[in-house]
Amino acid sequence: MKIAHVALWTRDIDAQVAFWQRYFNGVAGELYVSKNRPGFVSRFVSLASGPTLEIMSLPELLPTEQTNERVGWAHIALSVGDEGLVDQLAQRAQQEGILQAPPRWTGDGFYEAIIRDPDGNTIEITG
């Protein structure tokens, strides 16, 4: 068994897709426009390996209050396979104002930096 895809709601599908392309070399599929659910659009974004992302949007989505801990998914972690790449992505994120925590070794042995996507979702980048 494996995870096929992970779905993410967004208020700005173009910004979210561009983020995944820019930071993780995501390859975006065609825009799907639902004929059954007015306003619903989505795009799949494939990464080099692992599950794909389904980026979805509806005009009536409500913003979510961002808190550190809440019930539900806490974050997504992506292994880029190289400490140097973690450093490069963290530097880019710092310049763009989305770096949440700089690169560091965690107590459980991971080299990681933490960034936020355009909607404020937490993404760990590990080496």
Protein language model regions, located:
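A short, acidic/glycine-rich surface segment
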Residues: 29-31, 60-65
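Short, charged/polar surface micro-motifs in flexible loops or helix N-caps
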Residues: 49-52, 60-61, 83-86
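Residue-level recognition of conserved beta-strand positions in structured domain cores
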Residues: 55-57, 127
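Core segments of cupin and vicinal oxygen chelate
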Residues: 9-52
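Vicinal oxygen chelate
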Residues: 3-11, 32, 43-46, 66-127
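Absolute protein N-terminus
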Residues: 1-2, 127
